Regions:
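Conserved MFS/SLC helix-loop-helix module at the cytosolic interface between two early adjacent transmembrane helices
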Residues: 54-93
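Extracytoplasmic gate region of multi-pass secondary transporters
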Residues: 23-24, 206-249, 253-256
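Helix-to-loop junctions at the C-terminal end of transmembrane segments
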Residues: 55-68, 148, 258-271, 349-350
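C-terminal transmembrane helical hairpin of 12-TM major facilitator-type secondary transporters
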Residues: 269-313
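Helix-breaking motifs and short loop linkers at transmembrane-helix boundaries and internal kinks
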Residues: 35, 67, 88-93, 238, ...
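Helix-loop-helix hairpin linking two adjacent transmembrane segments in secondary transporters
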Residues: 94, 128-179
Length: 389
């Protein structure tokens, strides 16, 4: 029963990844058709991320009231309908409106499933969970590259909708499975009463403030690559839109591979050591990226494992009773990075040119690395650092 539920959760995380990489791959074809500036993509990503932040911040209340299973089904269905709307939109304002349900659905899925896995499964399962997210975001630009080869980005969104609606159906039919697994868990383990923390209470915890910055930075790296990588390759490196979309597929494939390898190593190498390996991987990637597009694959490979490993440490670092509140806040700040990085680079590229994209990633990498060091020191001082976790 536990294994079947785990498979369902993995499938749900494919659904979480499906919408995230589409806009970046499709944008080189969308903005000329709509006759809008290239940096208008930031409006869409800003709305998606902002709604994801709101959804994540209130996720503990929603999940405690309706349960992880029902929230996940409803949220996945909502994102599927939004993707269908994208495929038929003929004005930019409609893309912006449809970004709202896309973001609201993503935040609830992300917060609920991450905390569920962190509490009930091992670190390897957490990495494999995010590996399946990587499968979702890898499949989407591949589908989009096929659509762009036929000169129609709309078909890419329609294909993504079909994938998402099938995942919704699987989740809907799995609802009885969640109930059985929940009852079994209550019989076999002593449940820790969840404690809801306010934003003010979390802000007063120095370790929480630090991990917020880390989450912001690592996700800013991830989504800056996903949103602007294709445009950088087209306008800065002379790639065709379909070849650029394929390279973004490789970027997300690298992210999935990094998480898969981290999951394989989970039983042999501690979580903190795997985070260190990821940091080293990103260091190599940002050194290569100014000279070769293969650096995008390496960024995904290294950065991909940092986020899920930090997420899995949430109950260890802060305690199981408050993990859902802090999990939601971490994911909210992660999406602040998603929300801020694309429009920020849009401004930077307008001022300095698209060619500075690799250097933008280097700055984000330095911020992330410095604050991970601060976080480890804070945990050691408070006695919460577990190097064997």
């Amino acid at each position: 029963m536990t294994i079947l539920l785990l498979i369902v959760i993995y499938i749900a995380f494919i659904g979480l990844g499906v919408p995230d990489s589409l806009i970046g791959s499709a944008w080189p074809a969308i903005y000329p058709e709509f006759g809008i500036p290239v940096d208008s993509v930031s409006c869409v990503t800003l709305l998606v991320s902002g709604c994801t932040v709101l959804s994540s911040m209130f996720s503990d209340r929603l999940l405690n009231r309706f349960g992880t299973a029902k929230v996940t089904v409803f949220s996945t269905a909502m994102t599927a309908l939004a993707l269908l709307g994208f495929s038929v939109s003929n004005r930019f304002v409609f893309l912006c409106l449809l970004a709202i349900p896309l973001g609201l659905g993503a935040g609830a899925i992300d917060s609920g499933l991450n905390n569920y896995i962190a509490l009930h499964y091992s670190a390897s399962h957490m990495n494999f969970l995010h590996c399946f997210y990587g499968i979702g975001v890898s499949a989407s630009p591949y589908l989009m590259s096929l659509a762009l080869a036929e000169n129609t980005w709309r078909e890419g969104y329609r294909s993504a909708f079909l994938v998402q609606i099938c995942i919704t159906a699987i989740l809907l039919f799995s609802l009885p499975l969640w109930k059985k697994s929940s009852a079994k868990a209550q019989e076999s383990t002593e449940e820790v009463a969840p404690q809801t923390l306010s934003l003010k209470q979390m802000w007063q915890m120095p370790e929480v403030r630090t991990v917020w910055v880390i989450m912001l930075a690592t996700n800013a790296i991830e989504y800056a690559c996903g949103t602007w990588g294709s445009t950088w390759l087209v306008e800065g490196r002379g790639f065709t839109p379909e070849n650029a979309a394929f390279m973004i597929t490789l970027y997300y494939a690298g992210m999935a591979l990094g998480r898969f390898l981290s999951g394989i190593l989970a039983n042999r190498v501690s979580t903190w050591k795997r985070i260190g390996i990821g940091i080293l991987g990103v260091l190599i990637a940002v050194a290569v990226l100014p000279f070769s597009a293969i650096g995008l694959f390496l960024v995904g490979l290294g950065n991909g494992s940092i986020y899920p490993n930090l997420i899995h440490l949430t109950p260890v670092n802060f305690g199981e009773s408050v993990s859902q509140s802090i999990m939601g806040s971490q994911i909210a700040t992660a999406y602040l990075g998603v929300m801020v990085a694309p429009p920020l680079f849009g401004l930077v590229s307008n001022l300095l040119g698209i060619q500075v994209f690799p250097w933008f990633l280097i700055v984000l990498f330095v911020i992330m690395t410095v604050f991970i060091g601060i976080f480890v020191r804070q945990l050691k001082v408070s006695g919460r650092y577990d190097k064997t976790a």
